[in-house]
Amino acid sequence: MNLRRNISRRRMIEGASAAALVTAAAATVPAAMASPETAASGPGLPKGNWRIDTHAHYSPDVYNDYLKRYGLLGAITGAYGPWSVDRHLAFMDQYRIQASVLSFGDLQVTVGPVDDRRATARAVNDYARDLVQTRGDRFGIFAVTPMPDIEGSVAEVDRALGELDLDGICLLTNYKGTYLGDPSFAPLYEILNDRGAYVYVHPTGPDQNPAPKLCFGPDIPAGNNVFEYTFDATRAMTSLIYNGVLRDYPNIRWHFTHSGGALPFLAYRLATRHSAFPPFNEVLPEGPLKYIKRLYFDDAQAFTAAQLQPLSSLVPADHIMFGSDWPATRHLYAADNVETMPFLKGSLPILKAGDPEPTVDEIYSRRQRIALERDNALDQFPKLKARIRRAGSR
């Protein structure tokens, strides 16, 4: 596999539909934990930092050293430059984000000898523990594993969710073409199920060499993130459903990105296949929709009515959360985003207003929006919620 060719640079931003931002004053509430009742009773949103970002990435030095060993640093961080705690906090403050739950995106710790991958996962998760101990009111973290090394991953999950007390685990949609529903992953799912773990799944590209050709022409070096991320997430969710993982391990909470990729559009098409293909009923007689409703999603780069309405019709409202995908989306959140994307004027994040997704107002009430951008996440991350409350009481 040509790693440089297949690792995405995330340089293109997915489209968004036009909308206007509705703004108004709100009662002042503590930044550490704004009250939903106070906010919902008035016409505006809470003041101060109140959002919870469930899709945000980080790249500490210990991880950068790992990437350098395999010549991959530029492929992963080249699109958005070096990451730092201060830089991330500055972005969060600009968009009124109280806390970000950090994770790795594409690649994670999948390259190199197994001993190096295990050691890197341990070192990264130790860094994560230290960051949470010092800034736990601003950051949660999904621990990384040395997948597809099952034995090493089981050990690291046990350590990360126990000794290190991190908020969840991050995985990829496939590992060298093996999707998450594969029976070989059963030992990992057993410990995740026993722990009642929250598992954040970031898409990667399909294991194809050469990579699927896109239709942009030779002068646009777009990677897997434009199309294949959404399609691969759909493959992974389908794999989990039809291989019985969601049925057999009901305590695992699965989180997928980008408003569900192609799944909201394809869900009912998938369900109707049961009438045409008897094997579908033999494998999953109850159908797929009940399991889709169990999944959790963020709306990173997918916060318009065209994207959120289909998802909202498919899953419970409290299963959808805010995600920024920062810093990979730094151009989307920049002050000059209208200049670089004038065709999206009216639907882009508004830096001056500190609003990362103004189009949400098209389909949600303010109370619903506060739930999407904060409360739903706090319900799923009790450790983070407790850390925020402790910080607010100081």
Roles of regions detected by a PLM:
Residues A34-P36:
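Sec-dependent signal peptide cleavage junction
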Residues I52-A56, S100-L102, I141-A143, I169-L171, ...:
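Hydrophobic faces of well-ordered beta-strands that scaffold small-molecule active sites
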Residues H57, T204-G205, I241, G260, ...:
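Catalytic metal-binding/acid-base residues of hydrolase active sites
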Residues G48, H57-W83, R118, D207-F231, ...:
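Active-site gating loops and adjacent loop-to-helix segments of metal-dependent hydrolytic enzymes
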Residues N2-P30, S41-W50, T54, V62-A99, ...:
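Mid-to-C-terminal alpha-helical segments outside catalytic/metal-binding sites
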Residues Q98, L102-M237:
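Active-site gating/metal-coordination segments in enzymes
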Residues L164-D167, D194-A197, N251, K293, ...:
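Glycine-enriched alpha-helix->loop->beta-strand junction motifs that scaffold or abut catalytic
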